[in-house]
Amino acid sequence: MEMMVQKQRHEEGEEERGGLCAREIKELDFFSAAGAGAGRRDDDDVLRADGISSSHAGFMVSTALDLLTAVNDGDHHEEKKGQSNIHQSKQMDAAATTVEGELRQAGEENRRLRRRLEELTSSYGALYHQLVQAQQLHTKHQQQAPIAGVQLLDALAAASPASHRRRAAAAVDGDRTADSDGGEGDENVSPSLGSKRPAAAATLTRLTPESGSGGENNGGGEQAPAAEMAPCRKARVSVRARSEAPMISDGCQWRKYGQKMAKGNPCPRAYYRCTMASQCPVRKQVQRCAEDKSILITTYEGTHSHPLPPAAAAMAKTTSAAAAMLLSGPAVSRDALFAAHHHVVAPPPFFHHPYAGSTMATLSASAPFPTITLDLTQPPPTTTTTAAAAMLQLHRPYAFSSLPFSMYGAGGGSHRPPVVLPPPSSVVETMTAAITRDPNFTTAVAAALSSIMAGGGAQARTPPRGGSDAAGDINGGGGADHATAGARAAAAATQPCGTSPT
């Protein structure tokens, strides 16, 4: 349709230029598609048939499709280049596949090595833990080895067969018979002084609570069960003295390094360190008594590592001896530690202390460490009976303070019921009550004291602080014979009420 419009316009232009050639005017139906198509075909046919002029030939459009291309050298080169590119890409793909396989193998090897490393690390940790436990156990055994040895010796002593005790009793009976025979020949010799030191030791062995109360029940070779032991590796010595000064003068130089309020006591507790040597480990605590403000309580801990001046030797020896009493020898039984107060035997250096005649040594279970208390506030003994009771208390405290005297045996084949004493305030009161109840015991003690006074009067010295002669003998004036006499007096205490000590 557009072609026809252009053609018509072209014809009109030519007519305007001069109308040189007349054209046939044809009617065209623009509203009929079929007519338009037919007219277009007719026009094309007419143009082809009539041979349109050269001006019209310029408008011919070639609609042929040249699908066949000629092959030349350039195209062949491009084809070879494409094939080489394809070959190179295939080679690169193969190389990439090979590298990928190698990486996969390396990853597997890495995972295997990692698992092996984890296993080795776990094994090393387990072995190291076992090594640490073994070292701790070895150290613990080394620390407990000395205590275990002491406990073993004490257990063997506590669990000694009944036959040993019977042999000791037989030795004591034989010694008593010999004493009786010797007394008939020489009336001036006291029966109490005729015994030997081994007999006194056997008598004291017989006075133990285990042999006195359970010896008959453990007959037939049975062993008494050993008391449960509680090792004492560290001890403190507490000294109670009346003083208005901030602290008692013990001859050492101290430096205060702390102070705090103690529970249940309004008075503060001061802490001191010995400054007489740079490495001295001795410490002490000073505090007023809550019940009596005039009493000053000084607690010592440790042993001096330097020479002491003469003024400090007395107190240092006293505290060292009291601490050594807990740390040396058999371990303290746990039953004794749980008791409120138990009187203990002081070692020989403690006997020579000026306050030994009036000192009451007690063990305390309320302190975190085993503590022995030396009470210097007690008045010294003033009578012969009290001195003898104190001597017997020092020789065997447990036998006389925990068991009645009638429980150690029965005389004449008859068994007397045990006499239950009321709880006394001290061992001295216990001894006084026992003396008033047993006339034979009173006779034996009187004989022993008279022998001591007659035999050691020349060597007796006046005890400090108003002590008696008997107390002075105990503190070091009487010698070995006086100690043996005290042991014989203790042996006489174990005799039944119906028999004679000789």
UniProtKB/Swiss-Prot annotation:
GO process terms (BP): abscisic acid-activated signaling pathway; abscisic acid-activated signaling pathway involved in stomatal movement; positive regulation of leaf senescence; regulation of DNA-templated transcription
GO CC, any one term: nucleus
Domain of life: Eukaryota
InterPro entries according to UniProt: WRKY_dom (IPR003657), WRKY_dom_sf (IPR036576), WRKY_plant (IPR044810)
Coiled-coil residue windows: 96-123
Extent of Low complexity compositional bias: 197-211, 481-493
Compositionally biased region (Gly residues): 212-222
Induction: Induced in leaves during natural senescence and dark-induced senescence. Down-regulated by abscisic acid (ABA) and jasmonate (MeJA). Down-regulated by salt, mannitol-induced osmotic stress and drought stress.
GO MF annotations, alphabetized: DNA-binding transcription factor activity; protein homodimerization activity; sequence-specific DNA binding
Disordered: annotated segments: 75-95, 166-231, 456-502
Disruption-associated phenotype: The leaves of the oswrky5 mutant plants retain leaf greenness during dark-induced senescence. The mutant plants exhibit tolerance to mannitol-induced osmotic stress. Enhanced tolerance to drought stress.
DNA-binding region positions on the chain: 243-309
SUPFAM superfamilies in alphabetical order: WRKY DNA-binding domain
Xref: PANTHER family: TRANSCRIPTION FACTOR WRKY5, WRKY TRANSCRIPTION FACTOR 36-RELATED
Family: Belongs to the WRKY group II family.
Function of the protein: Transcription factor that acts as a positive regulator of leaf senescence. Is involved in both the onset and progression of leaf senescence. Upregulates the expression of genes controlling chlorophyll degradation and leaf senescence. Acts as a positive regulator of the senescence-associated NAC genes NAC4 and NAC58. Acts as a positive regulator of abscisic acid (ABA) biosynthesis during leaf senescence. Acts as a negative regulator of drought tolerance by inhibiting ABA-induced stomatal closure during drought stress.
General remark: The gain-of-function mutant plants oswrky5-D (T-DNA activation tagging) promote leaf senescence under natural and dark-induced senescence conditions. Overexpression of WRKY5 reduces grain yield under normal and drought stress conditions.
Annotated protein name in UniProt: Transcription factor WRKY5
Gene name for this UniProt entry: WRKY5
